Amino acid sequence: MKVMEKKKRDWNSLSIITIITIILLTPCLTSELWVTVYYGVPVWHDADPVLFCASDAKAHSTEAHNIWATQACVPTDPSPQEVFLPNVIESFNMWKNNMVDQMHEDIISLWDQSLKPCVKLTPLCVTLQCSKANFSQAKNLTNQTSSPPLEMKNCSFNVTTELRDKKKQVYSLFYVEDVVNLGNENNTYRIINCNTTAITQACPKTSFEPIPIHYCAPAGFAILKCNDKDFSGKGKCTNVSTVHCTHGIKPVVTTQLLINGSLAEGNITVRVENKSKNTDVWIVQLVEAVSLNCHRPGNNTRGEVQIGPGMTFYNIENVVGDTRSAYCKINGTTWNRTVEEVKKALATSSNRTAANITLNRASGGDPEVTHHMFNCGGEFFYCNTSQIFTDNITNGIIILPCRIRQIVSSWMRVGRGIYAPPIRGNITCNSNITGLLLTSDTPVTNNSGNLTFRPTGGNMKDIWRSELYKYKVVRIEPLSVAPTKARRHTVARQKDRQKRAAFGLGALFLGFLGAAGSTMGAAAVTLTVQARQLLSGIVQQQNNLLKAIEAQQHLLQLSIWGVKQLQARLLAVERYLQDQQILGLWGCSGKAVCYTTVPWNNSWPGSNSTDDIWGNLTWQQWDKLVSNYTGKIFGLLEEAQSQQEKNERDLLELDQWASLWNWFDITKWLWYIKIFLMAVGGIIGLRIIMTVFSVVRRVRQGYSPLSLQTLIPVQREQGRLGEIDEGGGEQDRSRSVRLVEGCLPLIWDDLRNLGIWSYQSLTSLACNVWRQLKTLGHLILHSLRLLRERLCLLGGIIQYWGKELKISAISLLDATAIAVAEGTDRIIEAFQVTLRIIRNIPRRIRQGLERALL
């Protein structure tokens, strides 16, 4: 019996363990997916932030670019970094790149700042009385290196003196092309474009010598760089890297020829937005630079004329030689080879052969378009390029005749002009031709026919595009959601007091995007490190900037515009704080991976198979799939967190019972008195109800109480002797109901009875629950036993029928084999009989003939 009872107890324990295991494993067997928040994923979107510039400007230099760079740019990073992104394919479009617009605005700001302190030539919009000027030309200039001399006019005009109410007459030399005749009078002139253009005189020390400028993205943003050779500037790029800043770009303002730019890698590259439009510019990037050496010989005497209070006009007092005559030299052999390669590249781009491509001179337009215009040593050169844009290019030294203009149309805005004061002495500048700006006479619509390309210019954005074609700015979006099988543990009956650990700072900012080409599963492993890199990169960039400014504090002079660019770098810190605020609204503050209670909807991407998205997709690809649902998911996360906080608040109210010391707080005594009075009232009411129920029960049994305060003795049985003094006889068995007197004994008696009753009730309830659990355990155990028996029976049946089927199959195969063998034997025997009959036919004929003869 003891052994049976022990086995019974073991079976009961086993049944309870089985029930608990089933209850715990039931949630694990479900395949429902839940929303999981990931912070630090390598995801980005196209953006147009305010970029800031960096340069190695020298504050002691008076050149305009240096002055502007010291006031608008920060020092360059001494250790620039570039991180390649494997397995990343990104789209670029040089024709719709906000970086070009920003650089264009910056160069306009540079020129405006260079011309801002200089004199407006509005007072010179007066009538000029001019006559032909006679002076001796220099004899050292040949016809090969100079243009034909131009006639000069000696003009007199009235200007305001230091006293505004008085005027005086002054004299100045002007070339004929800088003045326009008025009316029919031969001696009356005015300055060209004076009535339609606001002309600003450039400062005498302005040289416009460009220095390399780097464009950098603020922290929280990144610059993606396409490293594909022969990249057309638009489309997919497979070799992508991320950088802090671009390479150094020299903002050279020029037309027709690209000077001192970057060279192509591999082959000459041709880039055009729309080939079917003959107005679009074809940007040609060379592989090998061609030297361009320009020189302005001669000398002149520059004078100063006061044209008003505090306004000085720098004029030409005397001329020695033709100071407006200049020339540029190009190696004809190198240029001829370059032109042939350019023709091949244009032919390949337009689906033609090189024989169908022709280069010709500019057809017409403004002087800035028909000539190669550029600034050399503070003077604006206008060079005739008809000798190099032709099919008959000499192999010797090609000399391009140039002219220097004093009044130049401004490329920055319509209706503006620049007066360049004459520069003393010889001017020489050596440059490198790195590209061409061309237009086609006819649209490229088919694969046949000849094409003629001509040099063009005027839109300076094309120059910036030739350098920024391989860059784009993106905004890093480190916050993403994805489906997983894990669910957040929510508050049920006890307060979750687990503290979230804050992660530290470290690593590099660019390394954050290093896992962009990895799958979601591989990148998710390093989310904590990437989240650290995100904020660490922001802090590191700020520290690098502050160190660079501190190191060059005596050189750096930030203007208001420069401070604005500097403040743009603080945008990333604000974005990081915003992301942390959003994570806080979802209950995920300080976590790189945060599980939630929001179920993943079956209509959302990735609901069918999570293994496919985690093993095959990158975070960038996944973000494109789920981008249409993120708004709804974010809203559900906020609602779930609000409900979670409500549950925690409700539970927090019960958490006051956790501290016993709070029970003795004097502020809660009134609450204790109230509870005591309510308890006493409840006990008294319960006592009255129990008394009434007791009286009713006894009355129903035939009992009529005389008084509730009188002891009622129980009648003694007849025939019994009473108790005597000597102790004889039987003890009296009469009893009386115990009467409790006083308030406290009454309360104690009621509490005792209530406690006993509660204990008995709870004990009975516990016993019933235990019996039910044992019954349920026996039932489950019995069910499992029956299931095992049924499975064993099913296995036996399957084994039996499998054996029978095997035997039947073998028998069928044997019978088939026997039948086939017998049939084959009969066929062979019949065939043999037929052959014997055929073989015996001659014998039978012979035997018949023998019988006939006999």
From Swiss-Prot:
<keyword id="KW-0946">Virion</keyword>
<keyword id="KW-0325">Glycoprotein</keyword>
<feature type="disulfide bond">
    <location>
        <begin position="226"/>
        <end position="237"/>
    </location>
</feature>
<dbReference type="GO" id="GO:0019064">
    <property type="term" value="P:fusion of virus membrane with host plasma membrane"/>
</dbReference>
<dbReference type="GO" id="GO:1903908">
    <property type="term" value="P:positive regulation of plasma membrane raft polarization"/>
</dbReference>
<dbReference type="GO" id="GO:0005198">
    <property type="term" value="F:structural molecule activity"/>
</dbReference>
<feature type="disulfide bond">
    <location>
        <begin position="125"/>
        <end position="194"/>
    </location>
</feature>
<feature type="glycosylation site" description="N-linked (GlcNAc...) asparagine; by host">
    <location>
        <position position="154"/>
    </location>
</feature>
<keyword id="KW-0261">Viral envelope protein</keyword>
<feature type="coiled-coil region">
    <location>
        <begin position="624"/>
        <end position="658"/>
    </location>
</feature>
<feature type="region of interest" description="V1">
    <location>
        <begin position="130"/>
        <end position="154"/>
    </location>
</feature>
<feature type="glycosylation site" description="N-linked (GlcNAc...) asparagine; by host">
    <location>
        <position position="260"/>
    </location>
</feature>
<feature type="signal peptide">
    <location>
        <begin position="1"/>
        <end position="31"/>
    </location>
</feature>
<feature type="glycosylation site" description="N-linked (GlcNAc...) asparagine; by host">
    <location>
        <position position="274"/>
    </location>
</feature>
<feature type="glycosylation site" description="N-linked (GlcNAc...) asparagine; by host">
    <location>
        <position position="195"/>
    </location>
</feature>
<dbReference type="GO" id="GO:0016020">
    <property type="term" value="C:membrane"/>
</dbReference>
<feature type="disulfide bond">
    <location>
        <begin position="53"/>
        <end position="73"/>
    </location>
</feature>
<keyword id="KW-0812">Transmembrane</keyword>
<dbReference type="Pfam" id="PF00517">
    <property type="entry name" value="GP41"/>
</dbReference>
<keyword id="KW-0899">Viral immunoevasion</keyword>
<keyword id="KW-1039">Host endosome</keyword>
<feature type="glycosylation site" description="N-linked (GlcNAc...) asparagine; by host">
    <location>
        <position position="336"/>
    </location>
</feature>
<feature type="disulfide bond">
    <location>
        <begin position="216"/>
        <end position="245"/>
    </location>
</feature>
<dbReference type="Pfam" id="PF00516">
    <property type="entry name" value="GP120"/>
</dbReference>
<protein>
    <recommendedName>
        <fullName>Envelope glycoprotein gp160</fullName>
    </recommendedName>
</protein>
<keyword id="KW-0732">Signal</keyword>
<feature type="glycosylation site" description="N-linked (GlcNAc...) asparagine; by host">
    <location>
        <position position="384"/>
    </location>
</feature>
<feature type="region of interest" description="CD4-binding loop">
    <location>
        <begin position="362"/>
        <end position="372"/>
    </location>
</feature>
<keyword id="KW-0165">Cleavage on pair of basic residues</keyword>
<feature type="region of interest" description="V3">
    <location>
        <begin position="294"/>
        <end position="327"/>
    </location>
</feature>
<feature type="disulfide bond">
    <location>
        <begin position="118"/>
        <end position="203"/>
    </location>
</feature>
<feature type="short sequence motif" description="YXXL motif; contains endocytosis signal">
    <location>
        <begin position="703"/>
        <end position="706"/>
    </location>
</feature>
<feature type="glycosylation site" description="N-linked (GlcNAc...) asparagine; by host">
    <location>
        <position position="351"/>
    </location>
</feature>
<feature type="glycosylation site" description="N-linked (GlcNAc...) asparagine; by host">
    <location>
        <position position="432"/>
    </location>
</feature>
<dbReference type="GO" id="GO:0020002">
    <property type="term" value="C:host cell plasma membrane"/>
</dbReference>
<feature type="site" description="Cleavage; by host furin">
    <location>
        <begin position="500"/>
        <end position="501"/>
    </location>
</feature>
<keyword id="KW-1168">Fusion of virus membrane with host membrane</keyword>
<dbReference type="GO" id="GO:0019082">
    <property type="term" value="P:viral protein processing"/>
</dbReference>
<feature type="region of interest" description="V2">
    <location>
        <begin position="155"/>
        <end position="194"/>
    </location>
</feature>
<keyword id="KW-0564">Palmitate</keyword>
<keyword id="KW-1015">Disulfide bond</keyword>
<keyword id="KW-1162">Viral penetration into host cytoplasm</keyword>
